[in-house]
Swiss-Prot record:
Family: Belongs to the nematode receptor-like protein sra family.
Top-level taxon of origin: Eukaryota
A single BP term in Gene Ontology: detection of chemical stimulus involved in sensory perception
Coiled coil stretches, renumbered: none
The encoding gene: sra-1
Main subcellular location: membrane
Protein name: Serpentine receptor class alpha-1
The species this protein was found in: Caenorhabditis elegans
Lineage: Eukaryota, Metazoa, Ecdysozoa, Nematoda, Chromadorea
Length: 331
């Protein structure tokens, strides 16, 4: 590691501030929670859900990206916190060369881009499962593998594209920061992430709307409804998860982009204070297993309650028919 210069006063104040320490503390809680909830969620996906094979494949890959990000984010943020607590008298040791940061930043971007692309990928998969009438297990498995492979390739390639032709000769305060000469490409990535965030939201709403129309159109076709039951349930759950993650991804992509594009117009101390909280990817990663677990549990309890109500109540023929119809409508 080469020490070209010492950290600036603004950088020292940032890393040693209680604002940053509290942000790191909150982030570590979210990271630990993500690890625990991810294990539970993956187990539930295979034991308590009726997700189709393609959905399960993409969801598992999404969990991999989320936890890759959380692991690398924990290393980088704790390293920064360590400097701000124990190395205040050695600020010449703070700065890191861009080459030394390459692996850390690249892995971090694999996690970020993987989560974003996986959201788009799983919505494409849900649209395909909803629209395609003969969505067999073999086709489902093939679709899941193709989409997951494409997302993996794009995730690995993202940071390589950002730093292409960059000599990596500068220094950075931490490995959160992309290489200096690649700042414009990093901003382009944030803009693409912002667009994809809105596309995912609109797609979620559109697929949910079509899902409801499909459910209504086949409500009296018992055989067809049974065949589509898994697709209807899976689609609704996935869309709810994607829509819930919209806010955190919007804050990250738009917030970081706005701050980076206006660095010359604001104080560096203000920039550091804001960027600490605008970076919300770790909370987006936490929301993924949390909401998925909630949706799986809520749907299972709702179905169980409906079945118990039907089997325990004394009803007229009309009431019994109406309750069965209502039970079929639950996704």
């Amino acid at each position: 590691m080469s020490n070209i210069t010492s950290a600036s006063a603004a950088q020292i104040d940032h890393a040693s501030s209680w604002n940053f320490r509290f942000a790191v503390f909150c982030s570590q809680l979210s990271i630990i929670s993500t690890f625990i909830l991810s294990v539970i969620a993956v187990k539930w996906i295979f034991t308590k859900s009726t997700f189709q094979t393609s959905t399960k494949i993409i969801l598992v890959f999404n969990f991999v990206y989320a936890n890759i990000h959380q692991f690398m984010y924990a290393i980088i943020s704790l390293g920064m916190a360590y400097k701000g607590i124990f190395l205040l008298d050695e600020t010449c040791e703070w700065l890191i060369t861009e080459k030394d940061c390459l692996l850390y930043t690249e892995v971090l971007y694999v996690g970020i881009s993987g989560m974003i692309y996986s959201q788009t990928g799983i919505l494409i998969e849900r649209a395909f499962a909803t629209l395609y009438r003969n969505y067999t297990a073999k086709i489902s498995r093939l679709v899941g593998i193709i989409i997951s492979t494409f997302v993996l390739i794009m995730s690995i390639a993202t940071y390589q594209i950002i730093i292409s032709d960059d000599p990596l000769e500068g220094v950075v305060l931490s490995c959160f920061v992309p290489a200096q000469h690649s700042a414009q490409r990093a901003n382009t990535f944030l803009f693409i992430a912002l667009i994809l965030t809105f596309v995912n939201l609109i797609s979620s709403a559109a697929v949910m709307f079509y899902n409801k129309r499909l459910e209504y159109s086949i409500r009296y076709k018992v055989r067809e409804r049974f065949k589509k039951r898994e697709a209807i349930y899976s689609t609704h759950t996935i869309c709810v998860v994607c829509m819930a993650q919209f806010v955190t991804m919007l804050v990250y992509s738009s917030g970081v982009l706005i701050l980076r594009c206006n660095m010359s117009n604001i104080l560096l101390t203000t920039f550091y204070k804001l960027i600490t909280w605008v970076y919300t990817v770790q909370y987006n990663a936490l929301l993924f297993p949390l909401i998925l677990i909630f949706r799986i549990r809520a749907t299972k309890l709702s179905r169980t309650k409906k079945i118990q109500d039907i089997t325990s109540a004394n009803q007229s023929q009309t009431e019994h028919y109406n309750q069965i119809t209502s039970a079929w409508k639950i996704t």
